[in-house]
Amino acid sequence: MSAPRIGVLALQGDVREHVRALREAGADAGEVRRAGELAELDGLVLPGGESTTIGRLLRVFDLLEPLRAAVAGGLPVFGSCAGMILLAQDVIDGRPGQPLIGGLDVVVRRNAFGRQVESFETDLVVDGVDGPAVHAVFIRAPWVEKAGDGVEVLARVADRPVAVRQGPLLATSFHPELTGDIRVHRLFVEIVRSELGLKRGRS
């Protein structure tokens, strides 16, 4: 099977780190900045950064509606930190009118673990990730305040969900691209491959 084509939204955040991790995990990965590139992708990563800034840039580059349509159409998407916020249905402590892509049936709390001075690292057991605990880096991170029935919680910190999955959508509060451990990215690549197999089976 050929490598799945996975784009990393290159407006802000740890774009190169995500691209490198995806390539190591077996994907044909590259940067994405234009709506027209979405149709060429088998999957997409929304990296961390500042969620309100990214939301504004999505409007500036006319990406918001195409991304909403892509998610609604079943494109597998992995959002880390700010990416989790963008995939949420609603945000607590967000800016008024903050643009969201949606698709993931969760309500998240922005900066739930505190501002940058209160960022931290910890080891997590993540369902679907084999081997030892995942070393997770949290930077002004959100958590999931409320999850719908169709959302699978993959990991928690202090009983708060920090990694979730709903069908082809995956989201983490933490930054797996910063540690050199590619297992979360490998999980997403496996999700993309599975969706490709289902799509081929339907065609």
UniProtKB/Swiss-Prot annotation:
Q: Which GO terms describe its molecular function?
A: glutaminase activity; pyridoxal 5'-phosphate synthase (glutamine hydrolysing) activity
Membership in a protein family: Belongs to the glutaminase PdxT/SNO family.
Cross-referenced InterPro entries: Class_I_gatase-like, PdxT/SNO, PdxT/SNO_CS
- Which species is listed as the source? Parafrankia sp. (strain EAN1pec)
What's this protein's name? Answer: Pyridoxal 5'-phosphate synthase subunit PdxT
Could you say which residues bind L-glutamine here?
Answer: G49, E50, S51, R110, I139, R140
Q: Which domain of life is it from?
A: Bacteria
Gene Ontology BP, a term: glutamine catabolic process
Which catalytic residues are annotated?
C81, H175, E177
Q: Which reaction does it catalyse?
A: aldehydo-D-ribose 5-phosphate + D-glyceraldehyde 3-phosphate + L-glutamine = pyridoxal 5'-phosphate + L-glutamate + phosphate + 3 H2O + H(+); L-glutamine + H2O = L-glutamate + NH4(+)
* Organism placement in taxonomy: Bacteria, Bacillati, Actinomycetota, Actinomycetes, Frankiales
- Give the keywords, sorted: Glutamine amidotransferase, Hydrolase, Lyase, Pyridoxal phosphate
Q: Where are the transmembrane segments?
A: none
Role played:
Catalyzes the hydrolysis of glutamine to glutamate and ammonia as part of the biosynthesis of pyridoxal 5'-phosphate. The resulting ammonia molecule is channeled to the active site of PdxS.
Assembly and interactions? In the presence of PdxS, forms a dodecamer of heterodimers. Only shows activity in the heterodimer.
Q: Identify one Gene Ontology CC term for this UniProt entry.
A: glutaminase complex
